[in-house]
Amino acid sequence: AAAIPVPVFSSSLLQVPALALATGRKVGIITASAKHLTAEHLRNAGITEGIPVVVKGLDDCPEWQKLHKYPNDRLDLSVIEDYLVQMARKLQQSDGVGSLLLECTDLPPFAERLRQETSLPVADYVSMLHWLLKCVPGGGACRGL
């Protein structure tokens, strides 16, 4: 706050404390790579040890890995979407999560299907921007988001 005079929303992870408070349950964080999302990232986003989270990544999704290994290949988005749905269901059933946070900026297109399939609240970078725009005067004028 001392560095610049405007609010900064740098990560969708900033929504995790609110999701945990709203549901009273664990938040399932889905990220591109679980091994690269460290405890330090979580702490810097205000996710303390008292906030229950489960982090899962797309590290084992071959179709998702094409993004990095074979960037010129065509992706089958339905395969990625189905993988995410199965992951979300497992988080819901086995890990007892009450909400989902899509940490990667490539994941918002899948949010609605995850909501439909799990009936859980699903937040992502786009939902964070919508919230911000609704909070500021004149923010509703940004209809493109």
Spell out what each predicted region is.
Residues 1-15, 96-108:
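N-terminal glycine-rich phosphate/adenylate-binding segment common to multiple enzyme folds
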Residues 14-19, 35-38, 129-133:
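Short gly/pro/ser/thr-enriched loop/turn and capping motifs at secondary-structure boundaries
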Residues 122-142:
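Short, flexible loop segments at boundaries between secondary-structure elements
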Residues 85-117, 121-123:
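Extended, basic/helix-rich recognition subdomains
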Residues 32-36, 59-62, 106-108, 129-130:
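Glycine-rich beta-alpha junction loops
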Residues 37, 43-94:
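Active-site rim beta-loop-alpha module in soluble metabolic enzymes
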